[in-house]
């Protein structure tokens, strides 16, 4: 199943803070996310203490926070270094 990916303003704002190498890594991971959000290399996990928020790893430091928005849409909420998980 293919998912459609949408973004929040917060995600776009924080995306601009990443360096070029991190953005290139993100592009590859988003291609995988569209096809299979639970693909092993994404290391997708539900965020502890939440019902509908998930994270996946861009690399060992950068994380993306997301949630399902219906059956075929993934909404990217935030991106940043590992500490962003403390906000959720």
Tell me the role of every PLM-derived stretch.
Residues 27, 34, 77:
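A cross-family signal for key residues in well-ordered alpha-helices
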Residues 2-5, 9, 13, 20-24, ...:
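Enriched for short, Lys/Arg-rich terminal
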Residues 10, 25, 41-45:
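Unusually extended, aromatic-enriched hydrophobic runs near protein termini
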Residues 31-56:
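A short, surface-exposed loop/turn module that caps and links secondary-structure elements
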Residues 23-28, 49:
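Phosphate-binding glycine-rich loops and adjacent basic patches that engage nucleotide phosphates
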């Amino acid at each position: 199943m293919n998912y459609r990916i949408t973004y929040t303003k917060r995600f776009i704002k924080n995306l601009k803070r990443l360096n070029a190498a991190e953005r290139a890594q993100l592009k590859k991971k988003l291609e995988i996310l569209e096809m299979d959000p639970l693909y092993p290399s994404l290391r997708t996990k539900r965020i502890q203490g939440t019902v509908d928020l998930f994270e996946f790893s861009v690399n060992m430091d950068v994380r993306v926070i997301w949630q399902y928005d219906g059956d075929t849409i993934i909404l990217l909420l935030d991106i940043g270094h590992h500490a962003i998980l403390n906000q959720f």
